[in-house]
Each structure stands twice: as C-alpha cells, then as structure tokens.
Regions:
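An exposed, glycine/acidic-rich loop-and-rim segment of catalytic or binding clefts
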Residues: 2-355
Length: 355
C-alpha cells in the first residue's frame, strides 16, 4: 500500500508556511508535491537498471518556485498559455487582464495560481492522493467571477500519476488549467533532451503562432513540417532552426490538436529517454497538448534541485489544455466557463521501462 508523508518545506517571502507531500508506492517510486502552486516537485521512477531517477526539473528552495518564471511543475491558471494583449470580450463586456509576458497575458498573470499557497487535504484512508483547493476572487488578475479550484493528484502502484482539475465560478469567466512539469526521462540533471529522447505526438495538426507568440487562428497539418511527430523521432529532429515557426519561439512552443476518439481519454504523446529506458505515456480528456522544449530555461546551480544546472532544451513539457487564446478565436473550442457550471479535466502520466 502507498505511503504518504507530509514534511515542512520553507516559508514564502510573505511568511506563509509551505509543505511537501510525498506519495511513495509499493515499488519505491514516488511523487513529491508542494502546496505553493499545487506543484509537482519530483517524480522518482525506476530506470532500465532498476535505479531510481528523478525525471522532472525543480528548484532547491521555495524562492525558485515563488519568483522564477519557468513554472516548474506548477498548476497554472486561470488561463494557461497566452491571451493576446491580455484582452477579451465576454457577454459584451471588455476585459483587460494583467500583462506579464511582453504585450501578452501568460499563464494567468503576475499573481497566477502558481504563486499562491493552496489548501491541501489528505486522508489517511487514501494515502496515494492529495487534494489541493484554492479560492480565486472576482477580479483576480482581471478575470471575472469568484472561482473555486481543485486539483487532485493520485500516484498508484503502477507508476501512474493522475491529475484531475475541477473548478466552478459564480460568473461567466475563462478557465483553462494545466500542469507545467518539465520532463527529462534520463534524469533531471542529465542535460539536453534533444538528442537522447524520442517523442511521438498523437496529432495530425498544430496551431501556428505569430512573432508575438500568439496563435494566428489557423490549424495546420503537421505533414511535411518540423512538427510532424506522428511517428517517434528525436526531439532535436523537430527543432529545425530554418523553420519560421521554430524561429519565433526559439524551439517548439506550440499547441497540437489531438486526434480524438470516442474514448474518455486519448493518447496525447509518448516519450522515451534513450539512456535510461524510462518511458512516458500521456493520456488526457483535453483537446490538445502544448509542447514546449524549454527554449528559455536558464537556472543556475544555486537554484536548481540537487545543485542542478538547467539550460536551454534541458527538458520538454506536455501541457494538456484547451487551445491558447481561444477566447479571441471563434473557430477554436471555447475555454469559457459558464456561471455555476463545472469545469473538469483529467490527465494521466504513465511511467514505464523499455528494456
């Protein structure tokens, strides 16, 4: 049976106490969570030799999670991704959100969900689960409505990490939640993933961006482009520096429209760390996965977990979510959450070994 331990972490700059929630399963694999940002701090799973590897990037101290702009492992919202110029119109009313990424609103603004200490609920009878809860007030970063948000993490004996997001608001609002974990399946300290990780994405289409990193509104076939990961290939083989889209983002920072079926969960992506043999399958109820190749990561040893140094392309993100800036593109599936209706999405990260 799984074991759950709760240990003190470090206080935030505001003096708020934070904690680490460590779920360890029968095989010795574990997931560590933090109530600041309802974040994933570590995922430790066995490699092909039976050694345990931590396969997500993270910070050594709380100030990294509180202030750095990489969002390591964080729950981001109310709306992940970019909203162009922080502007949208809802029910005939114009809204101006905080602008925290050039001229755009990114991942919910300055004081987004990753910057907040969530209330954690644990139950001794369910030792493989942690529930985080947050109240986001009306006007939070410019969003309408008082919103209650819940994130439930479960880690089982099969090395499956399940994340379930739910939310409800008393006014119509925007809601698009994701987890921003950075994966390096060879181990978080093992350097670039471009030449030693294979990636397959279950998507025949992707969403192009403009030079401001906002969606153009098009949905484009991946065939004959750098973005064709319909068969497994090295991540680096998809980063064609001559491609204009890659140039805009300094790598891959794009939304892929998943090939959906009638199943509740669709396979979004599969990855393998070639050196470790650790594999990852990502299933989701969402319509897309945003793939980011850590294009602007620059974390010095005094900040990285276990004194790690993280640089460009040192990980990849599989951010399951609705389409970015959907509120400004009528052809995209909506991210509007109606008053008193329930938002619910689920993603499963399944870790295995290719021996």
């Amino acid at each position: 049976m799984s074991k759950l331990r709760v240990v003190n972490f470090e206080p935030t700059s505001k003096g708020e106490n934070t904690h680490l929630y460590i779920i360890e399963n029968n095989s010795g694999a574990s997931v560590t969570l933090c109530d600041l940002g309802a974040s994933v701090v570590s995922i430790k799973v066995p490699n092909k030799n039976g050694s345990i590897r931590d396969v997500v990037l993270g910070y050594e101290h709380i100030d990294g999670y509180e202030f750095d702009g990489t969002y390591f492992g964080a729950t981001v919202g109310r709306c992940c991704g970019r909203i162009a110029y922080g502007k949208f119109t809802l029910n005939g009313e114009d809204y101006q959100l905080s602008v925290n990424n050039g001229s755009n609103h990114l991942h919910g603004g300055f004081n987004n969900f990753s910057r907040k200490v969530w209330l954690a609920v644990v139950d001794d009878k369910v030792p493989n689960t942690v529930l985080f809860m947050l109240d986001s007030p009306d006007g939070d970063e410019g969003y309408p409505g008082n919103m209650k948000v819940f994130v439930r993490y479960t880690f089982d004996d099969e090395n499956v990490l399940t994340i379930k997001w739910s939310a409800v608001s008393d006014k119509d609002t925007i809601c698009n939640l994701t987890n921003h974990s950075y994966f390096n399946l060879n181990g978080h300290k093992s350097g670039k993933v471009t030449e030693n990780h294979k990636l397959k994405i279950n998507a025949n289409s992707f969403i192009p961006i403009n030079s401001n990193l906002n969606p153009t509104g098009e949905i484009t076939p991946v065939k004959n482009t750098s973005f064709d990961f319909t068969e497994p290939k090295l991540i680096g083989n998809g980063i064609d520096r001559k491609n204009e889209q890659i140039g805009f983002a300094n790598g891959i920072d794009h939304m892929f429209e998943l090939n959906h079926s009638d199943e509740e969960f669709v396979l979004a992506a599969e990855a393998e760390g070639i050196d470790s043999g650790i594999t990852l399958k990502c299933y989701t109820s969402q319509k897309g996965v945003h793939v980011y190749t850590a294009n602007y990561v620059d974390v010095l040893p005094n900040m990285g977990k276990d004194s790690a140094t993280y640089g460009e392309n040192s990980a990849f993100c599989l951010e399951t979510q609705g389409f970015p800036d959907a509120v400004n593109h009528k052809t995209f599936p909506t991210t509007i959450l109606k008053a008193n209706e329930n938002y619910t999405q689920t993603t499963k990260y399944i870790f295995g070994i290719n021996k």
